[in-house]
Amino acid sequence: MKRTYQPHGTPRKRTHGFRVRMKTKNGRKVINARRAKGRKRLAV
């Protein structure tokens, strides 16, 4: 049986990348929340 997670860099970056997050107000909210929490990785 084929597994559900078949990782590929491009689609991943396109949907969850930093630049995509910065495009919308809520995306920026996500980045700021992760900054405040002290996350090492802000986006993908």
Curated annotation (Swiss-Prot):
Q: Does the keyword Ribonucleoprotein feature in the UniProt annotation?
A: yes
Q: Which GO terms describe its molecular function?
A: structural constituent of ribosome
The domain of life is Bacteria
What UniProt keywords apply to this chain's record, in alphabetical order?
Answer: Ribonucleoprotein, Ribosomal protein
What Gene Ontology biological process does one annotation of this record name? translation
Where is it found, in Gene Ontology cellular component terms? ribonucleoprotein complex; ribosome
User: What's this protein's family per the entry?
Assistant: Belongs to the bacterial ribosomal protein bL34 family.
Q: What is this protein called?
A: Large ribosomal subunit protein bL34
